[in-house]
Amino acid sequence: MGRAGISSDQQTSRLFNYTILQLDKINAYYGESHILRDVSFTIDSGEVVCLMGRNGVGKTTTLKVLTGLLPARSGRMMFDGKDVTKAPTDQRARSGLACVPQGREILPHLTVRENLLLGFWARSDKPNGTVEKTAFDEVYHLFPKLTQILNRPGGVLSGGEQQQLAIGRALLSNPKLLLLDEPTEGIQPSIVDQIEDVIIGFKQQRRFAILLVEQGLHFAARLAEKYVVMAKGAVVVAGKSTELTAEQVKQYLTV
């Protein structure tokens, strides 16, 4: 059994490079307002992709479509080889899609440990006690502060503590793709550095893919293997970080 309770078969399948997510001409609306316009991009297994753009261009809306919170009016979403365009949110989560939203969505009246358990219970496999201990130990290794506050209600935590909890909870679901919506926003610099180190570690392990919504090019440049840049609800630039210049990306980030 691998780290964080990943089965040997699952580990083997992730060693090979394949497309874990494919969006094909996704269109989404709020009421009659056309928000996403023919959004198309792919993410490979183990890849770190940064979704970038100014405020209001559709980045968070894209994540809502990915998680099923907002249905696409047209287009197709393939996840891990299956068409999940019409799949409900809980089915997507069980299939390995985990999200840390901008608001973190920590349940305020549950303790830190209870919040973490919600992530673990979302797993699609049937882990035993050894797997549970291994998975929790890894989260505590990544975010040791959590071990000191396990019995505190989530609502009394600082922003940085809540972000660590939210990421830890998502990791316990054993994701194939982790969505992070501006994980460093409003967080103290020391926690930002810690989150960056965690992402770099997962990038090196290539255990799962990460889609990172980020506005800061400096932070994104240290992590991204691919950029997907949006403007006015559409993808305007997409490519490997080795193929795009900073100026090609920056022109769509500055006002």
Show where each model-derived region lies:
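The feature captures the beta-strand-to-loop junction immediately N-terminal to the Walker
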Residues: 52-54
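Conserved ABC transporter NBD signature motif
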Residues: 75-83, 95, 131-136, 141, ...
